[in-house]
Amino acid sequence: MSIRFIYGRAGSGKSLFCINQIKKLIDSDKEKKIILLVPEQYTFTTENKVLNHIGERAALNTHVLSFRTMCQKVFEECGGRVKQIIKDTGKHMLINKVLNEKIDDLSYFKKMSREQGFNNIISELITEFKKYNIDIDALRDLTDKIDDNELVEKIRELSLIYEEFNVKMHSSYIDTDDELTLLAKKLLANNIYANSEIWIDEFTTFTPQQLEIIRIISKTSVVNITLCMDKIENSDAEDITNVFSSIENTENRILKLMEENNIGYLNPINLNSKLPYRFKNSEELAHIEKYCITYPFKSYKGKNKDVRLYKANNTYDEIEKVAQDIIRLVRDRNYRFRDISVVCRNIEDYNKIISVIFNDYEIPFFMDKKIKLLNNPLIILITSAFEVLLKNWSYESVFKYLKSGLTGFNTYDIDRLENFVLEHGIKSYKWNEEEIKKLKNISIENGATEEELTIFNVMEEVRNSLISFHKLIEGKHNVRDICKALYEFLLSIKAFERIDEWIIKFEELKLEDKVKEYKQVESIVIDMLDQAVEVMGSDVVDTFEFFKILNSGFENEEIGVIPVALDQVNVGDIARIKGREVKALYIVGINDGILPAAHKDEGILSDRDRIELKEFGVVLAADGRSKAFEEQFVVYTALTIASEYLMLSYPMADFEGKSLRPSIIISRIKKILPNLVEESSLYDLSKGNDHFNKVISPIPTFNELIFALRRELEDEEIDEEYWGEVYNWFKENEDFKWKIENIFKGLRYSNTGEKVSRNKLLSLYKNDLGKLSFSVSRLEKYAECPFSYFIQYGLKAKNRKVYEFTPPDLGSFVHDILDSFTNKVKKEKIAWSDLDMIKCKNIVSELIDTKLKEDSGSILNSTNKYKYFSKRFKRVISKSVSVISEQMRRGEFEVFNNEFSFGSYNDGEAIVLELPSNEKVYLNGRIDRIDTLDLEGSTYLRIVDYKTGNKHFDLNEFYYGLQMQLLVYLDALLKNSEYILKKQALPGAVLYFRVDDPIIKTKGDITTEELEKEVLSNLKMNGLILKDAKVVKAMDRGIETDGYSLVIPAALKKDGDFKAGSEVVTEEQFNLLREYVNKKMIDLCEDMLCGDIKIQPTKDSDGSHCEFCDFSSICQFDSSIEDNKYKIIMKKSKDEIWNNIRDELNDDKKEN
């Protein structure tokens, strides 16, 4: 028989021509068998087209088929598959079996064959080999012809895998990729389509398998094939840069097939001779079709009415504009939702935001994409049950399993268990029966609550169900037994029953997509287990190997969904838009690198490999360069699919705020349509034409109403006059009535924090003895932010406890060791001058070992990671102690006491602040180290505070109440020196010492002495020192000879005066600071008890308190809200600070 080509560019009416010709055939010969062959994804829409144009009589003798459904039909009528068909999951399992058996014969692929995802790559390559009829022997013969050694290795090993796969496959099964080969054999043996009329539409190219089917059916039937291209004579030369190159190549291959098989050539039909049928109502779209791929091109001179271009700020703005425009078309131009499609090249990035916005705008839509099975709760349950075993009961795997929702435990119990597990660091061996019992017994001894005992019961239930399953799969077992154990485990925890319960709920909520997904997932899992038993039932594998196979199957499983209604906007990928009747099309995300898409992944066979194989007659799928030009055809198809209206858009920023560039398509369209105005949120043409453009559907209109009311409250001019009527409509609407009532509350909302009554605060802040007892650091926290303080110390809010070693834990640990070190030195009467690095190291090591031994449950004993930390702490503390000993050695100050507490009723009395309101506040604290110096009949005090961070004394922060600790400690000691020291004392210094083992950077080699000096300089104490040269020299004798100190922040001139930059203050200034710190503390306490809990975090040039606040999610501080303002810490000069302190103290004295 014969073949006829039907030529026509996009929109020329090829599909309509086919249907009209089919209608004529039906009218003239009602017995004629007619086949309309289209790609798989277009069968549904094509069937609708045929029924709409021809009517029900078309169903009698016209069959709309894809190559796959043709296989099914032929096998049903003629018999076919005598072997069981293997699905993708079984195929992956078979590949895995082949790789395991042939692993010793592989060298190039040996290492990568064990990688996750390699099975998928091989599966895709085998599919490609079969589609392109690649013969194993021909492939193997290439190894003697190719010079590229790497390619030779690839081909040799791929041939081995391919051959072994086919042997195993064909012994018991048939692959879906072999169906077309089997179909070809059936068609040769049975003249099922003899004297039929075959119409082939919507194909761009054909695989060799498909071409073989066309060859066979064209021997006995008339075959009509549509080609989307110009009719070009003598187009033998291949030009891949031509947009139609892939279709021209298809034409040439069919012509060659006809010549070799003596198939007749009917006169072709050329539909390009007249105005494209699709664009009969739009000159602009016809112009785009004609010139979007033509060089040189012509510019459209007419007015622009059918094409829009929108530059969006971001993807949200982009999709919201699309939604508004869809509503406009439906409302004002009588479009149906089914006439409209929204497409993009990166549908995964857009599907969620489209769903949210379209639902808000009440736009019915169908998301034309398959659902990944890997995210289904049943799959998460199965994979995590394996991961618990494979990852040794890690926190992540256990709670991934529990939070699947299918274990039978309620959310409340899971949350409480999670908190308990995090707090106690329960993972790995701690999940065993003995450890759980040990923890339970300890809790009972400590008076465990009923809630805690419930947690242990839940733990035991979780453990028992999983342990029972793990016992059956741990180690090596045959696949049949593992599958059986998994199925019985799912039954035992009633996972399938819960899935059925969810399906009922989804049906009640009319969530059709969810119903379809969950109805399929159970059968997919069981089918996968059946495939595993069928293919690998007797194979012995370990748990990890089976998990890898199972997970690989889940990764590739997708659930297809079909539209649940007829009148819906179709949303999908650009590549799947062909075959639909689309009046209005929205192409979104037209950005550089996205449309046209960039093809980067070459796979196992690179582009160079494919080109070289092609030279030896082995033709595979297109290489990257060819795919890039094929992508141009995808773009051409997208730009020409709409018949009446086209809107193009691109965002300037992605979801993370990163800037995006427009695609080259945008500049091309601008040149073709020079009168096209690029719109944006600032310049929107539709707003000028539509007075009611903000009244769309309830939710977005309600949002616009809020903006209008806000503008009115702020006395801004409102152009629209209809908001009063809109407001009344919402007020009468039952769904929005309560929201309307809350609008004004929201608009007038001042996020500042309300005042709390004094009595309430007193009850919150007083301790068990009925006293207001605070630490200085607490007052500093109030100064940082009153609201944060109230949440932490008033409402007692806490972060979830986690079993980890935090910076505060490190601080406490270091303080304890340094305290123990000082006490040991004092007790054993070791002079600081006798301490060298070795002695320091030995003492510190002994102290840390003793501490960890006494506290066997310490986190530092828990894992190798924390044991390493304890070794590091030994090094850091040893270095710090050696530096302290050197600092003591260089001066004359002596350690008087360490870890001195006041307000504990042990060492010293609390500092008592008497407030103007007559309340008393008792301040407590702990001084890390007190040093004293007796000099010329006077005693000087030096207070040292150890810090594990890089803390520096800042007079500016002191002034604002953010750094009061050192001066409060000094004041407390000086006031109580007669009691503590048995004599009056004077201020000597207040200093911070950083506990660290610094890394010293040098430009070249240095001596040990120079290195020690660098370390001393790096760990130099910082703070304030008495401006007295004798006292300063008593802190570091070296200052006299060197002129600068390696111990304190001071340096001397030759005349004995202090150099600029020395942190020295006079005794009078020390007294001013003491007086000011008392005033500041009283002011802060008074503000606190007056109920001032305003949301006012401090902010300086380095950042704000909010950056490190644990309660920012509670206060919702937002600087864009009028009343939410930072308390700015202005950077003042030292002279300005001293003047301010004096002025405030003088004012205070005047008032009193």
UniProtKB/Swiss-Prot annotation:
Pfam families: ADDB_N, PDDEXK_1. ATP binds at G8, R9, A10, G11, S12, G13, K14, S15. Its cofactor is Mg(2+); [4Fe-4S] cluster. Residues 276-579 form the UvrD-like helicase C-terminal domain. Its EC number is 3.1.-.-. GO terms for biological process: double-strand break repair via homologous recombination. Gene3D superfamilies: 3.90.320.10, 6.10.140.1030, P-loop containing nucleotide triphosphate hydrolases (3.40.50.300). [4Fe-4S] cluster binds at C785, C1106, C1109, C1115. One of its GO terms (molecular function) is ATP binding. Residues 1-338 form the UvrD-like helicase ATP-binding domain. HAMAP family: AddB_type1. Heterodimer of AddA and AddB. The heterodimer acts as both an ATP-dependent DNA helicase and an ATP-dependent, dual-direction single-stranded exonuclease. Recognizes the chi site generating a DNA molecule suitable for the initiation of homologous recombination. The AddB subunit has 5' -> 3' nuclease activity but not helicase activity. This is ATP-dependent helicase/deoxyribonuclease subunit B. The gene is addB.
